[in-house]
Amino acid sequence: MPLLISPFAELDLIRQPEQQDEPLQAFDAADEYLLNHVAQAGLSLPSRVLVLNDSFGALAASLAPHATVISSTDSFLAAQALEKNLARNGMSYDAVPHIPASEALQGPFDWVLIRVPKTLALLEEQLIRLQGQLAPGARVIAAAMVKHLPRSAGDLLEEYVGPVQASLAVKKARLLFATPQPMEVRTSPYPTRYRLEEPAIELLNHANVFCRDGLDIGTRAFLPHLPKNLGTARVADLGCGNGVLAIASALDNPQAHYTLVDESFMAVKSAAENWRATLGDRDVRVRAGDGLEMQEPDSLDVVLCNPPFHQQQVVGDFLAWRMFLQARAALVTGGALYIVGNRHLGYHTKLSRLFRGVEQVAATPKFVILKARK
């Protein structure tokens, strides 16, 4: 893989999760453009730099020796990548503190460097949280590849920070410079809420939760076919989002024990709040993590999963395949993985390579619900 070469450092970076023969690099031209601009503008200690949505630590690791850097993302994998890439390049793994996007930031910040996220609601929430956190004369710069930079990103910067100037495009990347202005403090429109009829529950969704304004159609297809009569089974909701699958299952299985895991900190916070609102103090484990990577082998009886098919702007089934491998390792012999997926993704064939028995539980014109037994 090529090195990230900037005026600050030459770094050997890896993506998370790691893949054998990884076809993609852990930085892009927008990272390079932003680092070159910051170097030209002049960055030095004791500047406090906030880096938002740095997917694999390219920005934070480059700047760490030259300023006090704080990173904030909504991704457990991004936090893990930052630690690994710092250590990989001769720095302490904790040289840059990471603040989950679900938690408050503590300014003041002299620089705010933003990689524009795929979900603009996350950007809006982050900009709202910046209110009162900028030092006098602070610089706020957002970066993105042009193909992933909607006009509305600039509109949000202007609404919550101040006037925006766009750079020329360089290597298909662009920077947006926002000049902070005194503004009336705004309240956040997040979290949002919606109600389900079956089961009859209300779900809260923080800004970066998938389908935060309503139930996604895959989950809607899955809900009527969740397993029942689980007794005291140990159940995991893998990639739990707002927790709806686990909560619906728990309502039907009052003695089962649940673990909810997602790599989004905002999803985990949403799931924990939804569980408490619906099920009170019933015992549960809700955690951010790299799927079931840290789950003890042979420690689960059932896994529920609506697998993602993209990581940021990268589309593919590599995350789903990884989840299937993790589920197989965590399940006891005879345990079962239940999934929903688009018909065209061919999950039945993929699961048949890993599990001794795969059956179709139900189907709609667009989705299949599958049960794979270890």
Swiss-Prot record:
This is Ribosomal RNA large subunit methyltransferase G. Pfam families: MTS (PF05175). Its EC number is 2.1.1.174. Gene3D superfamilies: Vaccinia Virus protein VP39. GO terms for molecular function: 23S rRNA (guanine(1835)-N(2))-methyltransferase activity; nucleic acid binding. It comes from Pseudomonas syringae pv. syringae (strain B728a). Belongs to the methyltransferase superfamily. RlmG family. Specifically methylates the guanine in position 1835 (m2G1835) of 23S rRNA. It catalyses: guanosine(1835) in 23S rRNA + S-adenosyl-L-methionine = N(2)-methylguanosine(1835) in 23S rRNA + S-adenosyl-L-homocysteine + H(+). Keywords: Cytoplasm, Methyltransferase, rRNA processing, S-adenosyl-L-methionine, Transferase.
